[in-house]
Amino acid sequence: MNYNKKSIEDIDVKSKKVLVRCDFNVPLNEGKITDENRLVGALPTVKYLMEKGAKIILCSHMGKPKGEPKKELSLLPVAKRLSEMLNKEVVFADDDNVVGENAKKAVEDMKDGDIVLLQNTRYRKEETKNEEIFSKELASLADVFVNDAFGTAHRAHCSTVGVTHYLKEAACGYLIQKELKFLGNAVETPERPFVAILGGAKVSDKINVINNLLDKVDTLIIGGGMGYTFLKSLGYTVGDSLLEEDKVEYAKEMINKAKEKGVNFLLPVDITIADRFDKDAEPIVTEDQNVKEGYMGLDIGSKTAKIYADAIKSAKTVIWNGPMGVFEFKNFANGTIEVAKAMADSDAVTIIGGGDSAAAVNIFGFGDKMSHISTGGGASLEFLEGKELPGIAALNDK
């Protein structure tokens, strides 16, 4: 995939109507936004366009309204909060049809530097099917398209891909530019040693990621629930731990591939186990890689955490996707904390691949110590799988 895409700085936006696809899919509680990270992430692009005198039309989806208006998934709270953050009114074009009379009128009345936010794009069933009719309607509002929603870049929808067929100029915003810089460099031209850490519950979620990264990394570290399928493939007992029986053979193949490629493949040498899945369960650290009957692995052990931390310390590039254990339970958060700490203390380029690892890093207070925290869980996984992301591919090359 070509990562060298035109950015907003490469196009003249003065007095032009610029449709910006943002990711405002934020959590709401009784109409209040509970996590503003995605709004903060959009600000640099919006501010740049304001300064350059563009007419800014923002659009995004929120949740899954399944192609019909749902009041609780309206973007009104986003418009209100953005107005406060930008110190400028963001006009909300409340329109069940997204591009109806309200939206058209709001756009018509715009002056340079003004901002309009359209209603939830998924109010229209055509959006997720990438149907021409809605793509054309969205494109009809603007002269230029800017995609700044990395979180939906792996989806070919009207507001991410379809519009680019009807607007000649399509560029990326600062958020996507940063994602492409960090993830693209890591996958294509990493500084070495290059270490990837994969955790989370399932091997099946990361099959293509493991396979693709083994062609690129110097060390691959495995933790989390997926580790037990690998340990089982080596003949260890896993007790009641999470196990994907149908992936044991695949795990064996990957361990062999690592040997062939000369990749250092690290698995847990000890495990923090408990007799039940409960935040108050007593944590016991095993002597070796075996989990006894009646017990389940809920975190990597302390010896393993030290080995993983040492591997991170010697790296020049580190990518992490997926926690080492059940970090939501204090008794089983240590492995995840130790990995985050080692990355925070490192001089390497450190990249967190979105999702649960991003949540963990922020909860434990290491967020600002990382080089980059990806804003897209699914998108960053597909990126690491080596797949082309439709929302990026659709933009103009430099």
UniProtKB/Swiss-Prot annotation:
The keyword Glycoprotein does not apply. Pathway: Carbohydrate degradation; glycolysis; pyruvate from D-glyceraldehyde 3-phosphate: step 2/5. The gene is pgk. Keywords: ATP-binding, Cytoplasm, Glycolysis, Kinase, Nucleotide-binding, Transferase. Substrate binds at residues 23-25, 38, 61-64, 122, 155. Belongs to the phosphoglycerate kinase family. PROSITE patterns: PGLYCERATE_KINASE. Its EC number is 2.7.2.3. InterPro entries: Phosphoglycerate_kinase (IPR001576), Phosphoglycerate_kinase_CS (IPR015911), Phosphoglycerate_kinase_N (IPR015824), Phosphoglycerate_kinase_sf (IPR036043). ATP binds at residues 206, 297, 328, 354-357. It is found in: Cytoplasm. HAMAP family: Phosphoglyc_kinase. This is Phosphoglycerate kinase. Pfam families: PGK.
